[in-house]
From Swiss-Prot:
Record-linked Pfam families: VAD1-2
Keyword Cytoplasm: no
Organism annotation: Homo sapiens
One BP term from GO: spermatogenesis
Subunit structure of this chain's protein: Interacts with syntaxin-1 and ACTB.
Biased composition (Low complexity): 214-231
Keyword Phosphoprotein: yes
This protein's name: Spermatogenesis-associated protein 32
Amino acid sequence: MGVTGAHGFPCCGKGSVEVAEMRDDLSQHQIQEEQELEADMLEQKPQLQVDLDLDPDPDPDPELEIGQVPALLESELYPALKLEAELDTEANSNEESDFEEPMQLVCKIESVHSNMGLPTPQTFRPWSLNSNCRSFTEENHVSACHHSISAQTSKHLFWANKLIQASEHSLQRAINMQLNNGSAGQPIRSPLREAIPTNALCSEEQLQIPDAHSAPPTTSSQAPSPLLSSDLPPPIDLTELITFASSLAMASSSRMDLPSLEHMMKAPPQEALEPSTEPLLTTVEEREPENHAETLPEKPREARAPLKSWSQEDKNFAQSYFDFSKPGIKRATIKGQIQLLQPPATSPLLQGSKEDSVPPGKEKENPLLVKIHFKLSAPTIPEK
C-alpha cells in the first residue's frame, strides 16, 4: 500500500491538483452568476406584473411577454453575441449602402448622357419645316418641267353644236357604249379613213350630179300620217350627230384637193334649195364666216348634201358610220353649214402632225379641216 495524501500519489503533481482546484473554483463562480441572474429575473417578474396591472388593456397579449423574456435572457446571458450581431448588421448595411451609391451615380450619369443626346424642340421644328418646304419646291419644279399637251391632227377633228369637240376615238367609245345599252344598229368601224379609197369615185359623182335622183333611198315611200306631239320620234343624240358630220366630211373630201372640191360643191339656182313642206332628210347650207375672210378660200354660198342622191352602195357606206334607217332620222330635218378650212402650211403643230400621220413611202398632203354646224328640227305636223 502506498502513502496517502497530497504527496502520496507518485503520478500526480502539485500542479495538477492546483488545476483541479481552479476548475472547481470556476464552476462555482459560474453557478453563482447563474443564481444572481435568476434572482434578477425573479425581481423583474413582479415589476412586469405591476406594469400589466396598470395597463388599461383588459386583454394582454401573452405572446409579447413570452417574446420579451427570452430576448432579455439572451441579451444578458450572451452580451458578446449581441455585439457580434450588431457589428455584422452594421457591416452588411455599410456594404449595401456602398453598393447602392455607385449604382445611383451610374444611373444618374446615364440619364444625363441620354438627355443630352436628344434634340430640343427648337432645333427639331425648323428642320422639319425646312424639309417640307424643300420637298414642296422640288415637286413644283418637277411639275413645271413636265407638262402633258394633247394634240390631234386636223383630219381627226370635227366640231358639232359650236363648242362641243370630238374625235373619232372618243366618238367610237360613245357609240360602243350606246350599242351596249341596247340601241339597234350595225357595228361601226373605228378608223373613218378605211372607206375613203373604195368610195372616192362615188363621192365625186354625187358632188357632180347632186340632183340625179329625186328622193333618197332611205326615205319612206308612203306619205307621213298625222302625228301628235306625243307621237313624235325622239331626236337624234349628239353621238349620232357627230357621226353624221364625220360621214359627210369623209365622203366629200375623198381623194380631192381643196379647189376642186369647192368647184364641185357650187350650188344650182336658189329655187332648187328651198325646202318642201314634206319632211326632208337633210339640207346643208354653206357660207363663208366673216372672221376667216383672209385665211379661207372663196366658198360657195349654198350647196345640197350629197346624201340625197346616194345609191344602194352609198347607203351601205353611210350605214357603216350612221344609221339612216331610224325613224327619227327619216322624219327629222337637219339644217346646217359646212366650212372648209385650209390651215397655213407653215404651222408647226400641223407640220409635226403631218409628219407623224403620213407613212413612209407616200407623198405628204395638206390636211383638210371641215367644220360642220347642224340644227335639228322635229317633223312638222301636216294640216288637216
